[in-house]
Amino acid sequence: MMFMLILMSCSHWTITTQPLAAPWLIPRYLPPLHLHCEGPLQPLSRVVLMCLCILGLILNHPLFLVWGPSFLWLHRCHPLFTYLGGIIIYCQVISCGLNDVNVSTISLQMALWRPNESKVYLPPTPVSKVISTDVYVTRTNVYYHGGSSRLLTVGHPYYSIKKGSNNRLAVPKVSGYQYRVFHVKLPDPNKFGLPDADLYDPDTQRLLWACVGVEVGRGQPLGVGVSGHPYYNRQDDTENAHTLDSAEDGRENISMDYKQTQLFILGCKPSIGEHWSKGTTCNGSSAAGDCPPLQFTNSTIEDGDMVETGFGALDFATLQSNRSDVPLDICTNVCKYPDYLKMAAEPYGDSMFFSLRREQMFTRHFFNRAGKMGDTIPDELYIKSTTISDPGSHVYTSTPSGSMVSSEQQLFNKPYWLRRAQGHNNGMCWGNRIFLTVVDTTRSTNVSLCAAEVSDNTNYKATNFKEYLRHMEEYDLQFIFQLCKITLTPEIMAYIHNMDPQLLEDWNFGVPPPPSASLQDTYRYLQSQAITCQKPTPPKTPTDPYANMTFWDVDLRESFSMDLDQFPLGRKFLLQRGTTPTVSRKRTAVGRGH
């Protein structure tokens, strides 16, 4: 409409209409209509112009007469664009000449909807949706404090020591660069003495714990642990000038400090680690001395596993045959790194609903490796020397360093409150257990102990003394748990059974197997030689899925208390909530009759 008004108000104008539809859709009966006018339009002229435009459309498409009267109503919406019962109509203003004004061509169209002639794609099969625990778990206002006693461990920082003919473990390996995975066992709230007997209905509901606060206490002073190898594969100091050495064994006694790491991960399942291990070759085409293929491997992080120290998350026992490319404490071990990607993408979010980490490292020394080069440098990368035939080792390596440790950068000895987990599990302790994975290399000091072999020590002689190395660790774990209840409707029971059937077994809500319609044979005397040999009964599946794994067990089943103000973490919890203890220990006085 605005376009038509502009035309009608101009002193000189020209309008040309031309059908653009294909000949098989809109036949062309007359040539395009050309109109030219000079001078401003009078009201009567505007009416004439409108009629001429309508006439041009009618002449270019006779079918327009079928619903021509409706055009007067549609014209108010747009004068150059109409819809004709499923047929495409194109109207184009080819040229519009105004005095000293350039106007571009305007093209208007409307597509015709046709049935889809391509392949029909069915929607994907619906899958069960994982819902948050906040949907079907109801939280109460009852809180408990649970804390461990002082937890201590002492051992050798590089290797375990075995003595005797039976290789009895005398001193375990305890390093500041090991994972500490605490398996915290909680009491069953359904067998707990509650302050309010009407808190839940035992016929249709079950109780469980939700972790809402945690503090990992660390004792011992800050310190940097040093590791090394008496036969470290260090050929040259590539940071400084050197001379090529053709010795067969150029290993040296080298020590270093590792990357600095602080982390702890909280979940109701153990943390998942990742590392690179030795893979398999296709068709057995590998020969002795070939580079081993690498395979990405996931595994559960257990207590005592080595952390990634700056040399990579590798299985050094299978990928480094010389036992001298890394220090003693990891040369025959697997260094694992937490698989944060997999734990974050876990459907139910049980392995990591709370985590903290801090890592830092820089490179201190630069070396290269001694040995025969497995990969040859391409000739186009360098110009050969006329005096040196062998360019030497180009397998460069470095020694890591975690730099300075400071109390200002500590993640421990601080309370943390869990309000919203990153996954669907918002702190629910399924199975009355939680797993706490801890790494703290800022307290990795290795102490030296010395014992004299002779009583007369007036004159110093190094061979009269024996030197020992030990590492000590100290922990204190405190938690705040919130009592929650869950109503076991058929839908919720089916959902929990799909998530973990053992939970319903622990709650005495077992799902019986479907009845068998086939007839089974049962012999009476199973040990009789008169009958065929009977298959042994399959072993019963252990109820504890982590029985064969190594964890530091912490039993809190007798350490729960509602007196939050009697514990450091409990007082901090009450302070941040702005509340005071609501449970009264006073008994109501009972009146006596006289």
Swiss-Prot record:
Give one Pfam family, short name only.
Late_protein_L1
GO CC field: host cell nucleus; T=7 icosahedral viral capsid
Q: Which GO terms describe its biological process?
A: endocytosis involved in viral entry into host cell; virion attachment to host cell
Q: Where in the cell is it found?
A: Virion; Host nucleus
What keywords would UniProt list here? Capsid protein, Disulfide bond, Host nucleus, Host-virus interaction, Late protein, T=7 icosahedral capsid protein, Viral attachment to host cell, Viral penetration into host cytoplasm, Virion, Virus endocytosis by host, Virus entry into host cell
Any one Gene Ontology molecular-function term assigned to this protein's record = structural molecule activity
Give the matching InterPro entries.
Answer: Capsid_L1_Papillomavir, Capsid_L1_sf_Papillomavir, dsDNA_vir_gr_I_capsid
Kindly list the residue ranges recorded as spanning the membrane: none
| Assembly mode | Self-assembles into homopentamers. The capsid has an icosahedral symmetry and consists of 72 capsomers, with each capsomer being a pentamer of L1. Interacts with the minor capsid protein L2; this interaction is necessary for viral genome encapsidation. Interacts with protein L1; this interaction enhances E2-dependent replication and transcription activation.
Protein role? Forms an icosahedral capsid with a T=7 symmetry and a 50 nm diameter. The capsid is composed of 72 pentamers linked to each other by disulfide bonds and associated with L2 proteins. Binds to heparan sulfate proteoglycans on cell surface of basal layer keratinocytes to provide initial virion attachment. This binding mediates a conformational change in the virus capsid that facilitates efficient infection. The virion enters the host cell via endocytosis. During virus trafficking, L1 protein dissociates from the viral DNA and the genomic DNA is released to the host nucleus.
According to its UniProt record, which protein family does this protein belong to?
Belongs to the papillomaviridae L1 protein family.
- What name appears for this protein in its UniProt entry? Major capsid protein L1
Q: Which organism is it from?
A: Human papillomavirus 27
Organism lineage:
Viruses, Monodnaviria, Shotokuvirae, Cossaviricota, Papovaviricetes
Q: Gene encoding it? A: L1
